[in-house]
Structures are given as structure tokens and as C-alpha cells.
Amino acid sequence: IETTQGCILIDTAHNPAGAVALRGVLSEQFADVRPTLVIGMLADKDWQTILATLAPSVSRVICVSVGSGRTLPAAELAKAARQHCDDVLTAESLADGMKMTGGDVLTVITGSVYLAGEALEWLGQTGGESQRDLNEWKT
């Protein structure tokens, strides 16, 4: 999505295969840019592998918590991200994290379908917050 502050790429890479595919797109389509990665993940996903796949190829990682009870705390995600990238920040929310991007040429938002939905809401591209509840399975 092109904005006045730069390009935002939203991807739902929430598993290792998705992260590999995203890394491929970044290296092929944006070879001359080291993007900022805004990432938030659910604790029950393979977040260590996803970070190891994506973080080495970005200039900065901004870790955020996802709007789900299953979220991995941003601080825990950031601790792991520091093993792969020198510039790692944490934010309480996607909105706060996006303020930290400073209008970078390319910002990649990824790690969770929930986070992708939050990003679309933040950009004014969706119907509303209530749609997020559709993915919260109750037994």
C-alpha cells in the first residue's frame, strides 16, 4: 500500500513457509531496500524460526503485541529478535509501532493474520474491529 510516508507491505506470514515466501518476495521485488519489519505473533506459532528467517534481512525490527489473548508479548519477541538484528524496538500496539517507523521507504507488517487485520483497520481499509472476533475459536 503506497502512503504519503512510504510503502507498507502487509503479509500474514505466521509460519516458517510463509516467512520463507515473504523473504523471497522482499529479495526479488525490493532488492535495493532493507525494510523495517513490524512484527507481532501468537505465542503458539513457531516465532523463533520466523524471526530467524526474516530479521537478518531487515534494517530494523519493531515488535508489537497482537490483539488476541494468545499474543506473544512484544518484549519476549524483541529479546529473540536481538539475536538476528541490532536495531530492535518494542511497542505496545501496532499504532505505536508505526509511529516508530518514521516514514521508512518500506515497512513490512507481518507475523499474524490478526496483525494484518489490525494493519488494515489502522489504514482504514476494513469494516471494523468486530471482525477480529471471528477468528477467536471458543469450545
Labelled PLM ranges:
Residues L26, F30, A81, L123-G127:
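Active-site catalytic pocket residues across diverse enzymes, especially alpha/beta-hydrolases
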Residues G97-Q125:
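A glycine-rich beta-strand to alpha-helix segment
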Residues V66-R70, S130-T139:
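Short, flexible loop segments at boundaries between secondary-structure elements
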Residues C7-L9, Q48-L106:
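C-terminal helical cap/extension that packs against the catalytic core
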Residues I1-R60:
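Nucleotide phosphate-binding/pyrophosphate-handling subdomain across enzymes
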Residues T12, G40, A91, I109-T110:
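Active-site-adjacent beta-strand anchor residues
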Residues I39-A43, V66, G111:
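Cofactor-binding loop segments of dinucleotide-utilizing enzymes, especially the Rossmann-like FAD-
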